[in-house]
Amino acid sequence: MIASIGDSAEPPLRRTRRAQQQDRPPTQLAAAEMLHNMNGAETAASFIVKDASENKIASLTTLGNQSIAARKLVESLQAGAPTIKLNREDTVNVLKFLNDVYTNQLEVVNIS
């Protein structure tokens, strides 16, 4: 048999699944992790999304045990106001609350 440049005595290495998973782009890995987390344990975000109550009041009331911003949102939503009026401090608290929901920093503790 005639040897060519690319021939070697060893068979070509097969890529394992683990090696294939490492080649995925970081955005795909982040998306897969986010979907896995949403389907797994009860996160604050999934708790709010699954809430069927009007204006998500039930889930915000439960999260209000941990966050004054959630309580402030519940008060405004229960009043039925077309807008939610917030001062500077309340605005910062609501933004921190929404960041905590987004980054999964809140635990869902339903004590009712």
Curated annotation (Swiss-Prot):
InterPro entries referenced in this protein's UniProt entry, alphabetically: Baculo_Ac102 (IPR009477)
Annotated region (Disordered), positions in chain: 1-27
Keywords: Late protein
Protein name from the UniProt record: Uncharacterized 12.2 kDa protein in P6.5-VP48 intergenic region
